[in-house]
Amino acid sequence: MTDHVPINPCTIPQFTGDLDALEQDKNAITAAAGTFRDAGSNVDSEFQGLSAFYSAPEAAQLFATTKPVKTDSDFFADQLESAATALGEYITEARPIVARLKELQAKATAFSGKISGDAHWKDDGDKIDENNDLIHDVNAAVSAFWAAERTCANKIRALYCAPPLTADDGSHGANMYGYKGEDLNKAQDLPWGSQLEETHRAWEIGYWVKSFV
C-alpha cells in the first residue's frame, strides 16, 4: 500500500545547471557563426580578386569554384545562429521558472516546519489545502520547465531533421520527455509529495452525519 506523504522540499526539482555559463556559450556560438560566415566570404572574395590577373578560357569555371565555400559557410553560420537563438530563448524562459522552484522549495520547507511533530495535522482542512496547493504549484513549475526544454531542443533538432520531442502521455513512447501540468495534477503521488484529503476522527459527528445524508 502506498504511503501518501506531504510535500517534501528536498525532492522538489531544482535546476543544477548554470544559466549564466550557458548564456556565455550561446554568445560564443553566435560569435563562431560570424567567424565562419566571414571566413567563407573572404575565401571567395579574395579568390575572385585574382580574376584581374588571370585570363584563360577556363577562368569563369575556375573562379566559380569558391562560390560553394561561401554558400556552405553561410548555411552553417545560419544553423549556428539558429541554435544560439534557441538557447537564448530557453535561457529567458527558464530563469523565472528556476526562481519559482527555489521559492516553492522555501515555501515547502516552511510548511514542513508547520506540520512537524503534529500527528493530527491532516485533520486540518486548511493545512491539507496548503499542501495540495504547493503540490499543484510545483507541478506547474516543473511542467513549464520541461516544456521550455522541449521547445529549445525541438528548435535545434529541427536543424538536422530529427523528430520533435513531445510530452509523455503515459505511454512512454519514443521522443517523449516530461509531462504536462494537468497530467501531473491527476496523480496522487509524485516524487515531491502526495495530494492528500482531510482526515476525520470518530468524534466529528457532524462530518459523519453529513456523509450518510
What are these regions (language model features)?
Residues 185-213:
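Hydrophobic, gly/ala-rich membrane-insertion helices/peptides used by toxins and envelope proteins
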